[in-house]
Amino acid sequence: MRFVKHILLLLSLVTLSQLNAQIKISGKVVDDDDNPIELATIRIAGTALGVNTDLKGMYSLSIAQKDTVEVVFSCIGYSDVKRRLVEPKGQITLNVRLYRVSKELAELQVTEFKKQTTSMQTIDGKAYKLSPDVSGGSVESLISTMAGVSSKNEMSSQYMVRGGTYDENSVYINGIEVYRPLLVTSGQQEGLSIINPDMVGNIAFSTGGFSAEYGDKMSSVLDITYRDPEKLEGSVALSLMGGSLSFGQSSKKFSQLHGFRYKRNTTLLGSLETKGEYDPQFFDYQTILNYKITDKFKVSFLGNIALNNYRFVPKNRTTSFGTITNAKQFKVYFDGQEKDRFETYFGALSLNYRHSKSTDFTFLASGYLTNELVAYDISGEYWLDEAGTSGDSSGDDVIGGELGVGKYHEHARNRLKASVLSFSLKGNTSINKNNLSYGLLMQRENIYDRSREWELRDSAGYSLPHTGNGVDVIYNMTSRHDISSTRFTFFAQDSYKYLSGAGLFIFNGGIRLSYWDFNKEFLFSPRISVGFVPAANDRFSLRLASGIYYQSPFYKEYLESVTDENGNSHYVANKNIKSQRSIQVIFGGDYTFRALNRPFKLSAELYYKNLSNLIPYEIDNLKVVYSGRNESKGFVAGIDFKFFGQFVPGTDSWISFSLMKTQEDLNGVKVPRPTDQRYSFALYFQDYFPKFPKIKFSLRAIFSDGLPTTSPRSTRDIAYFRTPSYKRVDIGASYQLVGGSADGVRPNNFFRHFKSIWLGVDVFNLFDMANVSNYYWVTDVNNIQYAVPNYLTSRQINVRLSFDF
């Protein structure tokens, strides 16, 4: 009996020791670009044990000790990786790199889609590299083809998102918010986008419902990450509108990437109806330097210098508009010139400290400086006539009746200097299935403004406005300000993944607290989102997001126009201004499937925004003129669709379609907001010759509703009308001179140093559509106003040549 007891005791001890012998396996899963892969699955072969990686690609699981353990790493769109552990013990670190699944057809790639479980979508900018684009393949031009996004000016990098203005979009580069010039009023002046597409590594974009880590804007977030070069690399691009150069290099501890761009789109501006001497010169230099001090410390520097100069000497203009039965012609002869200068300097230093595998901190210090000058003195003599069948038919123009004759003079000396200095500390901590993010920010803003502009008109011998008591200007405005203010911000959020029998749940919740000493305003912004991938059918993914978002005013938004007893207008800073508020609810989903052995994805999002404390504004081309007062409320509601896939094997194409309505209560009258674009359609399509894939074609098409507008110094509650719809098709063809061979062998000559060389031809505005940017208003002595359309660019041909090495 005692023998049996001893045997049972021995068996119990052995069993207990086996139960206590646990192995802990942890590590990180990255892709072939060293980017962390979230939601990758790590499982133990032959068992039901498994976990998913967090937002940083980290994982951890514990298993009972065995002689041999096989760990399987998998993720949709990537090849599985297996690791066999022989007699594992204790804690084991296992870092794995997954490579994308692809079927090569020369250089064409067929890739699965990553599931979107949050409001932030990842965009592949490489698909847009050879696109026919006036801006030269800018990221913003790519963004404007997404669902819910629109752009009304091909010469500008600005875009509108779901009923918001250009000023309601946040743009980040490597975690640092960047800004655009404040005095730009037209696409001709704007120059180069602050984002250099040759340096971009990752693009993340949200049209609403974004998390608490992103700043106080109401509409969208564009988060850009510049890439780290892995070795010596570079590219050169030349076209009729400018050129670019980028090169990078990497060693064990140090990496650098530099980009130069130059733009001179004289031929494009020459297609405008206003003829004259256009002399635009836009230059941009950017650099990012990374140095790994130790395994725990890394320091980075991001720098940018942008010098944009625009000089224009107008000569004449002839514009025909109206209908067949009510045709009109507007003629102007000019004298004078415009000279603008926009200088931007930006620098950011970041220090990253990895405290442990689960915690890291980043300290950021950045400075932004803009020095802007808009100066013009332009006079003109104009004739507005009714085109008809009467008059002297032997002349070039057949004129009916004269509607307006006059002279005008426009003058401006607008100078603005602004600086933004910010310091922030951000951290990330992973605890089990939770990923905590938090941060503090202090931002100091300084504005120096000395602006003066006026306009004088003389119609048929009378100055406008005609009072009979002397000569008055039709418009004048002055602005003199020296303003300094400080903002403080804190955010904290948690991301949590939960795998149940029903499927995978992804939760994100956070708060954002802000204080601005200019108006003594404190803001509390809670935000939450939930993503779900059902286990019954993982081709579906659903997401729901909601939160309170604020548009914290910047300089233009809190300037209020005041007119004195002499009729002179000037801007004053409204210190009682409040942040505009948007309460958002967004519900969306994706469905991925395969057809013709190719991947496709159909996405849809339904959204509603309740708007309050609105600052009414009017849009004139790219100029947004705010009232400077919180005096309106409204809403935005709509639905977005996007069909994405490989309509042609190995190429990404997409179709976007949006329906939207936005309205506000302005002075007791319900009117559409200036961004009320009721419908929008965008297409980006790529193709190639199946037997000769070195020749590629790409097409970009946009068709969108016109926007509400009104006459100068008026408001929509009095009267408004809609501009014509925006219609544009750009097409391009590219031929790969070097690279792309099926066997991957490079030529045995000088061109062996190049990865690829592309020669391309683009046709901008293929169907020569006459799109309207804004209107020039002619007023006769009887105070009758005529809206003369200012048309955008007509059909143009561009030739480009690019080298990658």
Over which residues does each language-model region extend?
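Short, acidic, small-residue-rich periplasmic hinge/interaction motif at the N-terminus
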Residues: V30-D33, A40-A45, E70-S79, P88-P132, ...
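Periplasmic N-terminal accessory/gating domains of Gram-negative outer-membrane beta-barrel systems
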Residues: S79, I92, K114-N169, G175-F210, ...
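Predominantly transmembrane beta-strands of Gram-negative outer membrane beta-barrel pores used
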Residues: N202-E213, S219-Y226, E233-E277, D284-K292, ...
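Face-selective signature of the C-terminal outer-membrane beta-barrel domain
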Residues: K292-L307, Q337-N519, S603-L606, W654
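Membrane-embedded beta-barrel scaffold of Gram-negative outer-membrane proteins
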Residues: T362-S366, N576-R629, F635, L759-F764, ...
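Gram-negative outer-membrane beta-barrel transporters
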Residues: K497-A502, Y607-N610, S627-T710, S802
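Surface-exposed extracellular loop regions of Gram-negative outer-membrane beta-barrel proteins
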Residues: A535-V585, L606-Y626, R700-S714, A770-N774
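C-terminal beta-signal and adjacent terminal beta-strands/loops
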Residues: I702-T710, Y735-F805
